[in-house]
Amino acid sequence: MNRADIKADKTFDITVADHKFILPSEKMIINTNDKVMFNVTSKDLTYGFGLFREDNTMMFQMQVLPGHNNDILWHFESPGVYTIRSTEYSGPKGIGMIEKNVVEVID
């Protein structure tokens, strides 16, 4: 299967700058079985973009490099609430890069 042939049901554009995630909305709502593209742009440093389950296990992650196209396509197969965290060391402020319960997958 070629990724270029897969059409995303939803796309979320996220910016990262000064150790903060700038989200497109307060909560990103996704329907079960949607394929979602997360486009993440860094304005300054290399960051990580990870999605974590409620039990703190990681669902996926990618590095976010400034000046590059950073995206991930994910198929959400079941409902849940997820937290975004930076998964890359970006200095002492990076430990606070957590956006709790901002992704929700619904039936």
Predicted regions and their residues:
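Histidine- and aromatic-enriched segments that form or immediately flank copper-ligand environments
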Residues: 41, 45-66, 94
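Detector for Asparagine
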Residues: 2, 31-33, 39, 56, ...
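N-terminal edge beta-strand
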Residues: 4-35
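Extracytosolic and intramembrane catalytic regions of membrane-associated proteins
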Residues: 23, 29-53, 79-81
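Soluble periplasmic/extracytoplasmic beta-strand elements of cell-envelope proteins
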Residues: 13-15, 37-39, 102-104
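Extracellular/periplasmic metallocenter environments
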Residues: 1-8, 62-107
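A mature extracytoplasmic/lumenal domain signature
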Residues: 18, 40-44, 53-55, 78, ...
